[in-house]
């Protein structure tokens, strides 16, 4: 997408509070923090539905691509719509990883790794705090 949704930190905080987002959601989505493993509300959620960006409601993942990676964060094998997620090189913490962000608003979602199941071989390792689940 060519133009991302832009807001001030105060506007993002207000929007997330309005949505009833977890307190850590602002730090995760706007400052690339990571929630602690095995603490996110969607790690063990296997209901059918769609996972959206907590900040802008963009559809990111379908529950059919969710799997248990045993890593402590919700994991998906593919994005719902090509282009919904942007990838950037992340060299923080002495590692080189691929960061994932919402293409619509730039919210930090998590990271993608090349160790997932077939057919994609990818593991989108997401923070629950960056997601909002809409059941089918």
UniProtKB/Swiss-Prot annotation:
Pfam families: SelR. Residues 9-136 form the MsrB domain. It catalyses: L-methionyl-[protein] + [thioredoxin]-disulfide + H2O = L-methionyl-(R)-S-oxide-[protein] + [thioredoxin]-dithiol. Keywords: Metal-binding, Oxidoreductase, Zinc. Its EC number is 1.8.4.12. GO terms for molecular function: peptide-methionine (R)-S-oxide reductase activity; zinc ion binding. Its cofactor is Zn(2+). The keyword Secreted does not apply. GO terms for cellular component: cytoplasm. SUPFAM superfamilies: Mss4-like (SSF51316). The active site is at 125 (nucleophile). Belongs to the MsrB Met sulfoxide reductase family. This is Peptide methionine sulfoxide reductase MsrB. It comes from Polaromonas sp. (strain JS666 / ATCC BAA-500). The lineage of its organism: Bacteria, Pseudomonadati, Pseudomonadota, Betaproteobacteria, Burkholderiales.
């Amino acid at each position: 997408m060519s133009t991302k949704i832009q807001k001030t930190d105060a506007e993002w905080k207000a929007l997330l509070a309005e949505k009833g987002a977890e307190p850590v959601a602002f730090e995760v989505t706007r400052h690339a923090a990571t929630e602690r493993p095995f603490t996110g509300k969607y790690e063990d959620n296997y209901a059918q539905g769609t996972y959206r960006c907590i900040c802008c409601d963009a559809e990111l993942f379908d529950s059919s691509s969710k799997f248990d990676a045993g890593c402590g964060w919700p994991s998906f094998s593919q994005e719902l719509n090509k282009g919904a997620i942007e990838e950037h090189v992340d060299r923080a913490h002495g590692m080189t990883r691929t960061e994932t962000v919402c293409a619509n608003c730039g919210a930090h979602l998590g990271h993608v790794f090349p160790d997932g199941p077939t057919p994609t071989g990818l593991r989108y390792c997401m923070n629950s705090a960056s997601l909002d689940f809409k059941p089918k």
